């Protein structure tokens, strides 16, 4: 895979339920703490090294941001780091939270 792929919220939910992918959330810490998808890893510049060391490069990775825009750049970056199958979740966390459950920090 030389280019990341787009994935819908529904397809993301299916892959996560089947434990077929890891989900990373690149939103700021305050937003992540306030609410995130269960099982998501908060990926920041500070956690990137640990994530790449703990995750097999052949594990599919789905990138989530606010609206599905920033995740595209992050997905491409992860491909360049050596991950073989990377997705950008269309609509981001805002699309997910409209119809699917999430972990709330409140």
From Swiss-Prot:
GO terms for cellular component: cytoplasm. It catalyses: thiosulfate + hydrogen cyanide = thiocyanate + sulfite + 2 H(+); thiosulfate + [thioredoxin]-dithiol = [thioredoxin]-disulfide + hydrogen sulfide + sulfite + 2 H(+). InterPro entries: GlpE_sulfurtransferase (IPR050229), Rhodanese-like_dom (IPR001763), Rhodanese-like_dom_sf (IPR036873), Thiosulf_sulfurTrfase (IPR023695). Its main location: cytoplasm. Keywords: Cytoplasm, Transferase. It comes from Pseudoalteromonas atlantica (strain T6c / ATCC BAA-1087). It is found in: Cytoplasm. Pfam families: Rhodanese. The active site is at 65 (cysteine persulfide intermediate). PROSITE patterns: RHODANESE_3 (PS50206). One of its GO terms (molecular function) is thiosulfate-cyanide sulfurtransferase activity. Residues 17-104 form the Rhodanese domain. GO terms for biological process: glycerol metabolic process. Belongs to the GlpE family. Transferase that catalyzes the transfer of sulfur from thiosulfate to thiophilic acceptors such as cyanide or dithiols. May function in a CysM-independent thiosulfate assimilation pathway by catalyzing the conversion of thiosulfate to sulfite, which can then be used for L-cysteine biosynthesis. HAMAP family: Thiosulf_sulfurtr (MF_01009). This is Thiosulfate sulfurtransferase GlpE.
């Amino acid at each position: 895979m030389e280019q990341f792929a787009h994935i819908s919220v529904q397809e993301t939910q299916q892959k996560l339920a089947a434990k077929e992918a890891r989900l990373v959330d690149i939103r700021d810490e305050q937003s992540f703490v306030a609410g995130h998808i269960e099982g998501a890893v908060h990926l920041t510049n500070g956690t990137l090294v640990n994530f790449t060391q703990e995750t097999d490069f052949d594990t599919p990775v789905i990138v989530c941001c606010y609206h599905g825009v920033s995740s595209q750049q992050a997905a491409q970056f992860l491909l360049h780091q050596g991950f073989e199958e990377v997705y950008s979740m269309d609509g981001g966390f805002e699309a997910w939270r409209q119809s699917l459950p999430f972990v709330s920090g409140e």
